[in-house]
UniProtKB/Swiss-Prot annotation:
GO terms for cellular component: cytosol. This is 3-deoxy-manno-octulosonate cytidylyltransferase. It is found in: Cytoplasm. Pathway: Nucleotide-sugar biosynthesis; CMP-3-deoxy-D-manno-octulosonate biosynthesis; CMP-3-deoxy-D-manno-octulosonate from 3-deoxy-D-manno-octulosonate and CTP: step 1/1; Bacterial outer membrane biogenesis; lipopolysaccharide biosynthesis. Keywords: Cytoplasm, Lipopolysaccharide biosynthesis, Nucleotidyltransferase, Transferase. InterPro entries: Cytidylyl_trans, KdsB, Nucleotide-diphossugar_trans. Gene3D superfamilies: Spore Coat Polysaccharide Biosynthesis Protein SpsA, Chain A. It catalyses: 3-deoxy-alpha-D-manno-oct-2-ulosonate + CTP = CMP-3-deoxy-beta-D-manno-octulosonate + diphosphate. The keyword Transferase applies. It comes from Bartonella bacilliformis (strain ATCC 35685 / KC583 / Herrer 020/F12,63). The lineage of its organism: Bacteria, Pseudomonadati, Pseudomonadota, Alphaproteobacteria, Hyphomicrobiales.
Length: 243
């Protein structure tokens, strides 16, 4: 099946730890604009911001990007992009949906290309990225989500679990999950129809809902983890990177 991608960027105002972070200024532009620009550079398909707030819509429009308004109350970014998808594409022209977090301004075009490539395997429902953890302090940090997976090819895993704990035990690399996803459209439809699962709620990781319902997630291991913004400290680090 030929992949016809659509890139959706969920962006909301109601962040708990860093309010209005997607509008934070980085090198003269709002964070969300940096994300949209990198996504467009990948040239994979249309790039549209899914938002719940007029201020975000105005910010992205000022830089020539498209947006769609969604409801404020969604349990996850996946629910928001599914609502956006049904509004944008009721004709079902697009069969591969990339979910690029609005707080991931360090995303690269190559990262988007890499995650989409995983869907060329017809057995893969959802694709995502990971990177080896190098810093010791990150191995025990619950904010760094770890991937437990079985190797299926060079630099490629089939995910068995995601956790905030330090795992797996023993010698060998630990992998940091990068929150960038590519879904088959049918997989996204199935995912949002499922109730939040037991382990998802315990770990506070929505991707576990897919694994607990026998959906397959494949992971491409890339050289460098992409830095997302959850705190003021993260924001200052990103400002230095993108200066």
């Amino acid at each position: 099946m030929t992949l016809k991608p659509l890139i959706l960027i969920p962006a909301r105002m109601g962040s708990t730890r860093l309010p209005e972070k997607v509008l934070a200024e980085i090198s003269g532009k709002p964070m969300i604009v940096h994300v949209a620009e990198r996504a467009k550079e990948a040239a994979l398909g249309p790039t549209i911001i899914a938002t719940d707030h007029d201020a975000i819509a105005q910010a992205v429009t000022a830089y020539g990007h498209e947006y769609v308004m969604t409801h404020t109350h969604h349990q996850s970014g996946s629910d928001r992009i599914y609502e956006a998808l049904t509004r944008i594409d009721p004709e079902q022209r697009y069969n591969a949906i990339l979910n690029v977090q609005g707080d991931l301004p360090t995303v690269t075009p190559n990262a988007l290309i890499s995650v989409l490539q995983l869907l060329k395997n017809n057995l893969t429902d959802i694709a995502t990225l990971g990177a080896e953890i190098i810093e010791d302090n990150e191995k025990n940090n619950p904010n760094i989500v770890k991937i437990i997976g079985t190797p299926i090819a060079q630099n490629r895993l089939r995910a068995l679990y995601f956790t905030r704990a330090t795992a797996p035990y023993g010698n060998g690399p630990l992998y940091h999950h990068i929150g960038l996803y590519a879904y088959r459209r049918k997989a996204l439809e199935k995912f949002v129809s499922l109730k939040p699962s037991t382990l998802e709620q315990r770990e506070k990781l929505e991707q576990l809902r897919a694994l607990e319902n026998n959906m397959r997630i494949d992971v491409e291991i890339v050289d460098t983890a992409l830095l997302g913004v959850d705190t003021h400290h993260d924001l200052e680090k990103v400002r230095k990177i993108l200066a």
